[in-house]
């Protein structure tokens, strides 16, 4: 009876995916980084979705949910942007793509989980000097920042839920 329990207890990674190069648990998430081809992907909790990706050299081959965010400035009469904010930074995919397309504009990125930020630095090249990483709750931290932004993206969720306090009228 104890043999199956011992085998399960000593089997290694909690939810190992093929190509897994990192895993940890934080106060907020179970975090995995997997490498497929020349790209790293961030998986959280049940692994139902990618929360960030980074390909060697910053290459972006495909249109993704993150690259769609790049269209935001074009909903304005003047599509030039001088700065941006990202609520739900994760490992930095959105600000890295904004930097690649619009140049090294100042970007404030807010992420609740410091372990995800560290994974971003270690596995997703989240080291750009124009990206100001802020660890904290998106609603609170955005209210603490001084100034206005040309673009604010919100990509804070735990699949499949959006944090309720980021959906209130007070937030917007």
Place the predicted regions along the sequence by residue.
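Short linear motifs at secondary-structure transitions and domain/linker junctions
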Residues: 5-10, 16-20, 59-62, 83-85, ...
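A broad, structure-centric signal for solvent-exposed, well-ordered loop/edge residues
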Residues: 40, 49-51, 133, 141
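Short Gly/aromatic-enriched secondary-structure transition segments
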Residues: 44-49, 56-59
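A short, flexible beta-alpha/helix-coil linker loop
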Residues: 47-52, 157-160
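The AdoMet/dcAdoMet-binding core of the Class I SAM-like
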Residues: 67-172
